[in-house]
Amino acid sequence: MTRRAPALDREGAFLLAEGNREMSNAKSKTKNTTGWKTRTKLVHEGIRRSQYGEVSEALFLTQGFVYDTAEAAEERFVSLGEDEFIYARYGNPTTRMFEDRMASLEGYEDAFACASGMAAVNGALMALLKAGDHVVSSRALFGSCLYILEEVLGRFGVEITLVDGTDLDAWRAAIRPDTALVFLESISNPTLEVIDLKAVCNLAHAVGAKVVVDNAMCTPIFSYAAEAGADLSVYSTTKHVDGQGRCLGGMICGSRDLIRGPIEAYLKHTGGAMSPFHAWVQLKSMETLDLRVRQQATTALAVADALDGHPALNAVRYPTHKAHPQYDLAKSQAEAGGTVLTIDVKGGKEACFKFLNALDIFTISNNFADAKSIVTHPATTTHQRLPQEQKDTLGITPGMVRVSLGLEDPDDLIADLRTALDAL
């Protein structure tokens, strides 16, 4: 009997040689996920089983795929089926399961997995833009996002206009009839500004511009990008999806036309695709994503409440905490404000460093959304390359600390923070 390399069946099973079909059908069946709640989708969505009927999703750690004949190889390259594969840079069964699960969680038709969050941001922007285009973006962005906008896109003749993302009038004034794309962070990193996403989407779509949202701080659990009308929702899955500081990843979610059109074409040819191993690690992490993120968000609000008014602090900021200047907007858009808060330590950099060095449980690092609680000094790390004037405009002060809450007991975290602050 001629053997054929397996291809994926959209109904949930790998297509096998004719003699093995009965076993495949017995071990994998079509699942109607309509109406399933988030936690159920995070465990079951996108699963495709091979003829072996494995319970845990399989890791296809392979660069390429086998064809029975030269004619079969030619046919595959001429007309690649939706779930057929030719090379891991173009697609992989494990990666496809991860993409399907993320798209379902986000409420989009499709998704493309990338090597990192910044590969996802770069891929989304480069795939949709050309020389001479105009982009409007919020000015409060992660340092690497600012670099891509100002240095990379600027070098290729794309005009960039940065605005105060919290000011709808500023968006209205900046978006022009020839604006091609709007880019923003739904919750800015690290300043935690909140943008009226639906209003900005309406302004952009009125002139035919695409909207790309970096949703890393919002988290996939509390995301409202699809509901608000964003064309693409971009993630660093390194953060909450992996959630344990193990491996890099990124994801672009959107319509099938955008994802399997310009996005896939750009990324598969420029090498931004995700490793199958990283896809497998993060696919498995999604099973506990809702449980982890909700606990971290609950802890973040508890910490904000506990530190609010501490004499060593100028401010505590968390989107759904009553002291946040955009509290009402944040509460109207999302169930919670994410897993990160910021504090502003009195006494500037010197006092801030003393505070950081006095912490016992918190880890000093530049990542966030880990199971371990992490503290970061943005002015000297993630945003150190920005001119001081730009830091001042954004509100990145010498005393700002980004506090990422992990899965430790909230009482222990609060005690650790208070002890370090009380010593100042």
Language-model segment annotations:
Residues 2-15:
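Positively charged N-terminal leader segments that act as targeting/secretion signals
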Residues 21-29, 150-151, 159-161, 173, ...:
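PLP-dependent enzyme catalytic core of the Aspartate aminotransferase-like
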Residues 24-92, 100:
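N-terminal "arm"/small-domain region of PLP-dependent enzymes with the aminotransferase-like
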Residues 32, 42-51, 111-311, 317:
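Conserved PLP-enzyme active-site core in the AAT-like
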Residues 64-65, 254-258, 286, 345-350:
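Short loop segments at secondary-structure junctions
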Residues 69-119, 144-151:
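Conserved N-terminal alpha-helix of the aminotransferase class I/II PLP-enzyme fold
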Residues 105, 307-311, 359:
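Acidic-histidine catalytic/liganding microenvironments
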Residues 315-401, 405:
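Conserved C-terminal alpha-helix-loop-beta "cap" of PLP-dependent enzymes
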